Design a protein with these regions (language model features):
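Hydrophobic alpha-helical bundle cores within soluble ligand-binding/oligomerization subdomains
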Residues: 2-390
């Protein structure tokens, strides 16, 4: 149960909150995700994330998040058909990507811009009825892999590849990115990574989405706000730095000296620690398995051994376990995603979780309006200032 609201007529003063950054503050009730931080457990709609990642199809879990129940075979087929019909990007998006799909433009800025453009092109964007929001969500979910893949190719000076109507959602992602049909184990690996990144309760980007849609702004504005939050290095942006870090270290035997220097310099290494999980991130072990299998035939197989050594060193020296970004970065690199697209990849799968929260917020909406503890001066007079003229 959320705390009682502070009366707006009373100045908010007094002791500081128990934790900065709203640590431990319950902002809403939700039936989407349960995180047990001390135990290192994660559940989507009551299902353990380990079970979903190992046995479910990404689109099955999307349906679960959006509708609160497992899809029937007929519902799953219908969902696939709707996505297949909407995967192609509008011509206006291709025009914009020709302008901003360049190496000097931050990929997340491009994804943010195109998402906003898609909202401007959607004639029902301002309709907040559940059916209208779901229609917009299906269209955006279908197009996100197309967008990220097209952006990646434009940044390399290559033409985008149209989706293959014979391929499913996950397989098409790799096909559009690389130009060749993926192997089955690659599809399985990417499916696992997408499930593990698709939702994570009330993190900064999800809270941003719920706050925006709580004002009865439109679906695309809420998703764009979430993308803006995810872009930050303290949130999703950290994943982009993992592979460059491992490449810089180079060899497993170089890890101890590298970590010692980094800690002496006060550096924080990406991929370690989490605000909620103190003992272990349940997603990390599953992603380590994906990374190990995919890296066995990747161009840089030695990176996995560097990662294992670094994980052990950080746990011994700092007590910090690997988080969701760490091995996901290795898995994505092995699949052909360049590091600068890793955060954009998260957008393409996390849009499912953001949408679930947007739907839940709209179903029982109340404007999100917290208060601040005032710590400044009071009772100042303009007349007391020597520079003030009457």
């Amino acid at each position: 149960m959320a705390a009682a609201p502070i009366p707006t007529t009373t100045p908010v003063e007094g002791p500081a909150p128990a934790g900065s950054g709203l640590d431990g503050v319950v902002a809403c009730e939700s039936s989407i995700t349960l995180i047990d931080g001390p135990k290192g457990e994660l559940f989507f709609r009551g299902y353990a994330v380990e079970d979903l990642a190992e046995a479910a199809d990404y689109l099955e879990v999307v349906h679960l998040l959006w509708h609160g129940q497992w899809p029937t075979p007929a519902e799953h087929r219908a969902f696939e058909r709707r996505l297949r019909a909407q995967r192609s990007l509008p011509p206006a998006v291709d025009e914009v990507l020709r302008l901003i799909g360049r190496p000097e433009v931050d990929p997340m800025a491009a994804v943010r811009t195109v998402t906003s453009l898609l909202g401007a092109l959607d004639p029902r964007a301002d309709d907040t009825a559940p059916t209208a929001v779901l229609d917009s969500a299906v269209a955006l979910l279908a197009r996100m892999p197309s967008l990220v893949a097209a952006l990646g190719r434009r940044r390399q000076g290559l033409e985008p590849i149209a989706p293959d109507p014979e391929l499913g959602h996950v397989a098409n992602y790799l096909y559009m990115l690389r130009g060749a049909r993926p192997a089955e184990d690659e599809v399985v690996g990417l499916n696992t990574l997408m499930i593990l990144h698709m939702e994570h309760e009330l993190n900064a980007s999800t809270f941003a989405a719920r706050t925006v849609v709580g004002t009865l702004s439109d679906y695309y504005s809420a998703i764009t706000a979430a993308i803006c939050a995810l872009k930050g290095r303290r949130h999703g942006g950290a994943i982009d730095a993992v592979v460059p870090l491992l490449r810089e270290i180079g060899r497993p035997e170089a890890v101890p000296a590298y970590v010692e220097r980094a800690l002496d310099q006060g550096r924080k290494l990406p991929g370690f620690g989490h605000r909620v999980y103190r003992r272990r991130d349940p997603r990390a072990a599953l992603q380590a398995g994906v990374a190990r299998r995919l890296n066995a035939r990747a161009p840089e197989p030695a990176l996995f051994e560097v990662a294992r050594r670094l994980e052990a060193e950080m746990l011994t020296r700092k007590g910090l376990p690997a988080n969701v970004d760490y091995y996901a970065a290795l898995g994505l690199a092995a699949l052909g995603f360049p590091p600068e697209l890793f955060t954009s990849f998260i957008v393409s799968t996390r849009v499912a979780g953001w949408t679930a929260h947007i739907l839940e917020q709209l179903a029982n909406n109340r404007l999100i309006r917290p208060r601040a503890l005032y710590r400044g001066p009071r009772g100042l007079s303009l007349g007391a200032q020597p520079w003030h003229s009457h």
